A protein has these predicted regions:
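Bacterial lipoprotein signal-peptidase II cleavage site
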Residues: 16-36
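Extracytoplasmic "Venus flytrap"
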Residues: 27-28, 35-59, 76-81
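Short, polar/charged alpha-helical segment
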Residues: 49-71, 90
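Short helix-initiation/N-cap motifs at beta->coil->alpha
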Residues: 72-83, 170-197
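Ligand-binding "clamshell"
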Residues: 103-115, 130, 201, 206, ...
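A conserved helix-loop-strand patch within extracytoplasmic ligand-binding domains
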Residues: 115-164, 263
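A bilobed periplasmic-binding-protein/Venus flytrap-type ligand-binding module shared by bacterial periplasmic
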Residues: 122-133, 234-247
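Periplasmic-binding protein-like
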Residues: 150-159, 257-277
Length: 283
């Protein structure tokens, strides 16, 4: 999931999502029954990259053999996939992580639930001036994203690698005021998309995986520190309306998305480390 300052919006009309008109009132639809026609196509809303790419790999290489008919609808915003899932206009979606979904459900009174983790787009600490973490000293400046989600992730990455110490009990949305010990470092908050452009002006910067790639940085090779996939709350997952996780088609897709074939596809396609597999249950 790539959180940016502005999202291109695909209209409901263009995607054929106007038939019921319920997307404008997502809380109007109750949870699913899990009793859908097993022979019907499973329609999944997804962001184009890597989500739709991964689903297309499953559709073209694994689904037919598994007896699953899969239809992928691409969305470039982060609202319609959930509203369309809640209203039943699509069966599932794959584009988001847990902190985002929790916030979305709370604000919109929706009942979307995660099914299974698939991948992570890791944040990394980068520098054009330092060669390793041990070179980061008091008095130097670190740039971090200024939005709540990515800012909190950045602080956790720094804390996990001993760069800073956070106060006890700081959750996923930590702020600079939650730092217990800055270890003499200065911090500069910037919009996530602009952080790579500041690399020449700071000593180090925490950059989202997608923005690192755009800046021609390789997470696997260039990052001084990189988020770990295991147990990461920012892993992107397959999600459905509550009750539909019992749908046999959903369970089959979840199995395929966590298959050795998909793991190999991710490894072979994203050798730069911008996308890594993060299989398993959502916690």
């Amino acid at each position: 999931m790539k959180l940016t300052g502005a999202f291109a919006t695909i209209t409901a009309l263009a995607l054929g999502l106007t038939a019921c008109g319920t997307a404008s009132d997502p809380s109007s639809s109750k949870g699913g029954s899990g009793k859908a026609d097993a022979s019907a196509p499973l329609v999944v809303a997804a962001s184009p990259t890597p989500h739709a790419d991964i689903l297309t790999f499953v559709k073209d290489n694994l689904a037919e053999k598994a007896g699953l008919k899969l239809e992928v609808k691409e969305f470039t915003d982060y609202v319609l996939p959930n509203t369309a899932t809640q209203s039943g206009q699509v069966d599932a979606n794959y584009f988001q992580h847990k902190p985002y979904l929790d916030d979305f459900n709370k604000k919109n009174k929706t009942t979307i639930v995660p099914v299974v983790n698939v991948h992570l787009e890791p944040l990394g600490l980068y520098s054009k001036k330092l060669k390793s973490l041990k070179d980061l000293k008091a008095g130097q400046t670190v740039a971090v994203p200024n939005d709540t989600t990515n800012g909190g992730r950045a602080l956790k990455l720094l804390a996990d690698n001993g760069v800073i110490t956070l106060k006890d009990g700081v959750g996923a949305n930590g702020k600079l005021s939650d730092i217990k010990d800055k270890k003499g470092l200065e911090f500069k908050e910037l919009e996530a998309a602009t952080v790579p452009r500041a690399l020449n002006d700071v000593d180090a910067a925490v950059i989202n995986g997608n923005y690192a790639i755009e800046a021609k940085l390789s997470p696997a090779k260039d990052a001084l520190a990189l988020e770990k996939a295991e147990g990461n709350p920012y892993a992107n997952f397959l999600a459905v309306r509550k009750g539909d996780e019992k749908d046999a088609r959903v369970q089959k897709l979840a199995e395929l998305l966590n298959s050795p074939e998909v793991k190999k596809y991710i490894e072979d396609t994203y050798k730069d480390g911008s996308i890594v597999s993060a299989f398993g249950a959502v916690k």
